[in-house]
Amino acid sequence: MAEPQFAAPDPRDVDARAVRRAFGRAATTYDAAAVLQREVGARMMQRLDVVKLVPHAILDAGCGTGEAVGELSARYPGARVIGLDAALPMVNAARMRARRGNSLLRRLLSPLRAKADMAAPQFVCADVNALPLEGVAFDMVWSNLTLQWLNDLPRVFAEFRRTLKVGGLLTFTTLGPDTLKELRGAFARADGHTHVNRFVDMHDLGDMLVQSGFADPVMGMEQMTLTYADPRALLAELKAIGATNATRGRPRGLMGKARWQRMLAALERMRRDGRIPATFEVIYGHAWKGEPKRTPEGHPIVKLQRRPP
């Protein structure tokens, strides 16, 4: 009997355990360094201004330290907001932020009004690939700069759709292929290992949404460039937010002084106007959960309308 054949893991795939560890270690340094995440989150929030939806239940998938959870709670008073993250230290930091926010609100408002104006958010430590939220139906799923850390995006989109109500909104951001192209190029000059994540193209994401059953997907992209005084400042900021090399093909030992110096020298040659640039291709997407077209068993649903007499 022939031995079963198993596909070798792709070295460009993300190691989920390494991601959890990195973000767990970064829980205490994340807020001070998350410049890009905060700016992109603010732009996401602005895009909600034109959305005609008053959600009663919201999921923040990949909530990190919980900044967006508080902003969504303030934007939609009375809504049930659940923050979910795979890294327990991040979830604990988000809980602490929520407690501080609720305490401040109660000092500013009368206790009865504060309780009526803003429901306390809830937090869950779990994997976005398998949401442990049976029986919970959301009007909105929000996810800011999380999807780039996940390998099986069709599965993730299917989970989001499963937990949304009909007519519910998925709104998300992620990073596209040009992200950290300077750092990727510098490492390529130093050695042959994978050092930067693989990022999915905007058009492929739109196709995945349609294939997952979402309706009316809208995709957009913009490039943002952050600049740094030197290469070490860039690397230190990435480490502070947990964005370290978590690919399966990452080197397990130290890089070596000679190769490290080659990488730093390659980044130095990219210096413009005295600063080291780092490009981020930010992808924005939203889509809606429409009426189901098939039963859970896979049978097509045909709606019949009664003719007027």
Predicted features along the sequence, with ranges:
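A short glycine-rich, Lys/Arg-flanked "PGG" loop and its adjoining helix->strand segment in the class I
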Residues: 154-166
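C-terminal lobe and adjacent flexible extensions of AdoMet/dcAdoMet transferase-like proteins
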Residues: 236-309
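Conserved catalytic/acceptor-binding region of the Class I
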Residues: 169-233, 240-254
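Class I SAM-dependent methyltransferase SAM/SAH-binding core
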Residues: 57-131
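N-terminal, positively charged/glycine-rich alpha-helical extensions of SAM-dependent methyltransferases
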Residues: 1-28, 42
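Conserved alpha-helix/loop element of class I SAM-dependent methyltransferases that forms part
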Residues: 36-56, 67-71
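A short acidic, Gly/Pro-enriched loop at the edge of an enzyme's catalytic core
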Residues: 129-141
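A short SAM/SAH-binding and catalytic strip from SAM-dependent methyltransferases
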Residues: 139-152
